Amino acid sequence: MIYRLSDEYYVRPLAPADLDGPYPGWFEDQDVCRYNSHGKLFRTRAYFREYLDSLKLDDRVVWAICHERDGHVGNISLQEISPIDRTAEFAVLIGDKRHWGKSLGLLAGRQLLAHGFRKLNLERVYCGTAATNEGMKKLAAKL
């Protein structure tokens, strides 16, 4: 499953090959992790492998945001999906700083929310962020 976002960008499920790219290194970048808890602890390759394996078993949808030339540049997800309450939490991380400011959260977010509401039959999607995270607050308002 691949969803085209624009001529340059698309989303697809996170894959084992992503562990060999820049993805694990994003969590060592304090700018990338400024508004989340991912950068607080060192993460081993085994950690990322276990995370990827857990996606097959639990209540998350995690997509890689990809650029035609640069490959995997970020992730977007629905987490804590509750089939009973029909809710989920929205999260996004653009790890490749060359792609910041290109509205990827909005492009990918629209596609992910359409998937959540149409395919997963969700009724409500929420997100939480730091009060100082102006980018996420603006994104949430637009979505």
PLM segments and residue spans:
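Short, flexible helix/strand-to-coil boundary loops that buttress conserved ligand/catalytic motifs
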Residues: W26, N36, S103
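Short amphipathic alpha-helical segments and helix-helix/interface helices
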Residues: L52-D53, K137
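An amphipathic alpha-helix signature
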Residues: P16-P24, R45, R49
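Short loop/turn motifs at secondary-structure junctions and domain boundaries
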Residues: D53-D59
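Conserved GNAT-fold acetyl-CoA-binding loop/helix
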Residues: D31-Y51
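Acyl-donor (CoA/ACP) binding surface of acyl/acetyltransferases
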Residues: M1-L19, D29, V62, C66-L143
